[in-house]
């Protein structure tokens, strides 16, 4: 059956006007619909089960919805995949609906877990940034020999404003003190 998570918070006095506020969820499991101060922030106003999958990250720009003073409310509706209603599977433990969490369905020594681990299964938090944010950075290493490594850095850049921005992406890879910098227009 569906169930709700709900919490309230106030912005700290150190919050600076003109900054973006992002609401992050590291993991939600199965189906999730997100609300902020009574407004639906995932999918469309009439859609349901907007975030669908196992252990999915979600990020929402709540800058225009946040109250600078007073209480802000976050609510998340979680819906588990009810196997009996969603498909005619012969798997009574729900593994067909939870392939990434076989342990949640029970195997060998572990009993079945009601709800198949549905819910908010990671951290939820706010991040305050400028208009341009870096998302999902990673470093790939190719090792042609044991004495040499070729590194490539990749990331997505999101401009949340309506005007073009110029930014510099820079960083240092440790160990080795390997620095990099790139102008982005």
Name the predicted role of every residue range.
Residues 34-36, 148-185:
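Beta-strand-rich binding/interaction modules
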Residues 46-47, 138, 163, 185:
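Residue-level structural signal for beta-strand termini and adjacent loop
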Residues 127-162:
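Surface beta-strand/loop "capping" patches
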Residues 1-133, 160-161:
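Accessory beta-strand-rich segments of carbohydrate-active enzymes
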């Amino acid at each position: 059956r569906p169930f709700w998570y709900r919490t309230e918070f106030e912005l700290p006095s150190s919050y600076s006007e003109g900054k973006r506020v992002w609401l992050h969820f590291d993991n939600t499991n199965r189906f999730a619909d997100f609300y902020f101060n009574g407004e639906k922030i995932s999918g469309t106003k009439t859609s349901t089960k907007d975030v669908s999958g196992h252990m999915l990250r979600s990020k929402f720009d709540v800058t225009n919805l946040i109250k600078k003073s007073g209480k802000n409310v976050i609510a998340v509706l979680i819906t588990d995949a009810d196997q009996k209603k969603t498909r005619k599977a012969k798997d009574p433990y729900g593994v067909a609906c939870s392939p990434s969490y076989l342990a949640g369905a029970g195997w060998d020594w572990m009993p079945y877990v009601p709800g198949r681990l549905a819910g908010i299964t990671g951290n939820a938090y706010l991040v305050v940034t400028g208009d341009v944010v870096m998302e999902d950075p990673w470093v790939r290493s190719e090792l042609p020999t044991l004495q040499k490594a070729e590194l490539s850095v990749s990331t997505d850049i999101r401009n949340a404003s309506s005007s073009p921005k110029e930014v510099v992406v820079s960083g240092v890879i440790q160990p080795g003190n390997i620095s990099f910098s790139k102008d982005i227009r």
